[in-house]
Design a protein with these regions (language model features):
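Noncatalytic, solvent-exposed loop/strand surfaces
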Residues: 1-181
Length: 181
């Protein structure tokens, strides 16, 4: 081990690497936080997004989703519903709260889905009891580009999904594969 560092609180996301930065989500002082470290283990920056919604389990976290980058911008999503876009040096460009905007999270366990990127959008799948949907937001502005509801009935306790969608090319077009009941 070349170096290790403590996070402000339990974070369960997978770190992402972009050039000389290691980027991770974590709660910090009751807030949703995105932070970056250099290869030397020193913190480069830390940006607060909004109030944290803590994990249900003692080992859980409101920061389970992993951040993602297209090499131009960064994006992060949290259990609180906060979805945000950032510059590569951590400056907050925009944020929206999906739970305030659409519906409260009804997942039995803590959130597990992370955002994915298409050519133009940052996309999230929210699959739980009640209104479930796939929503796409403009990467630069955070404006809602489209939202598709899950339009079929699901058995009780089988309507939750914790999986991250996958963007694929299908007959020369982008398609989004979503796992869920």
């Amino acid at each position: 081990v070349k170096w290790k560092t403590a996070l402000p609180a339990k974070g369960c996301s997978t770190p992402i690497v972009w050039k000389d930065q290691i980027i991770i989500t974590s709660p910090s002082d009751g807030n949703d936080t995105l932070m970056a470290f250099g290869w030397d283990g020193k913190k480069r920056w830390q940006t607060t997004v909004g109030s944290e919604r803590a994990g249900k389990h003692r080992n859980g976290s409101g920061s389970n989703p992993s951040a993602i980058t297209d090499g131009k911008l960064l994006f992060a999503y949290f259990k609180s519903g906060n979805l945000a876009g950032f510059t590569l040096d951590g400056k907050l460009l925009w944020k929206t709260n999906l739970q305030d905007r659409f519906a409260r999270d009804t997942l039995y366990w803590d959130i597990g889905t992370s955002p994915v990127l298409t050519a133009k959008h940052v996309v999230l799948a929210v699959m739980h009891s009640g209104e479930s949907y796939l929503a796409a937001f403009d990467k630069r502005t955070g404006e809602l580009a489209w939202k598709e509801s899950r339009n079929y009935k699901t058995p009780v306790e089988c309507d939750h999904s914790y999986a991250t969608p996958h963007v694929v090319q299908y007959h020369g077009r982008e398609a989004i594969v979503v796992w869920g009941a």
